[in-house]
Amino acid sequence: MKIRGFESSMMGKDIDFIPPAMTRLCCLNEISHALAGVMAVEKAYNITVPNEGQYLREIARLGEIVEVDAIKLREFKNTDDLADIGNKIKSVLGKKAKYLAVGGVLENISDKRKEKLINLAKEGLNLVDKDFVKLVDERKAKIPLPDVELIDAYNFDANKVETNGLPKTALYDGKVVYSGSLARMYKEGLINSKNLWDVLSSRMIEIEFCLNKIIELLNKLKLTHPYMEPIIKDGKAIGEAVIEGGEGIVYHKVELLGREILDYTILTSENFNKAVLDSVDNDEAKRIIQLCERCYYL
């Protein structure tokens, strides 16, 4: 099923084409798209990834979230240094995730780099603005915006998605829903309001949350081999993966014949968030959500 158009370029390709292709799909979600694609293949063939590989992948994913949250806050605050820190952390998978592969991660980091990344994450924690949420609440009181329904990858059922138009907007269970930092931080219990203004607060809160998780995961690394050669079976197989990426939900579905890609489906948070913007039709809402045009239109 082709929701966006980019999927058609994947037909007939080998599964090794997924990471390099997906990292070029969107500069804000290069890890997320590549990871979701690789995980979909792993689901199709029940491939197990070593713990070390899982830790590295999660560190990169969280680093990308830090980067994207910081970039999306630039309209309201100087967060360039935080964006740079997130970018450096996500590079644990190499430039353009070149070490990401079906079966894990091809190369681990050194002990020296591990310590540098821990210090980098700690530096990021010192840059988190604890007063930012208060400033958002003040603006919320002056300029009212509606509450939104939320959807996250942890309670996601692809069968409940309805897509309309071309490029496609998406509803979930017949509702307009927001996917992204607010949904994630609401689920974590770190924010208790669903107002559109809270998207800004949730991004700053999430940066701190992710940096703490990154330090925790880096300390778990034993620097052993993070990759196991996968066994790709003959015959047809279907795999799906949904993760929380830099923007929000990233869903990939692959239909395979051995190593060959027969069909590919991609759905992103921006398919949902475009429906939110269409329903609100407000300039402030556009500044807050900052729809990723590339993820939506390509």
From Swiss-Prot:
A GO term, aspect molecular function: nickel cation binding
InterPro entries: Ni-dep_hyd_lsu, NiFe-Hase_large
Any Pfam family matching the protein: NiFeSe_Hases
Protein known as: Uncharacterized protein MJ0727
Organism: Methanocaldococcus jannaschii (strain ATCC 43067 / DSM 2661 / JAL-1 / JCM 10045 / NBRC 100440)
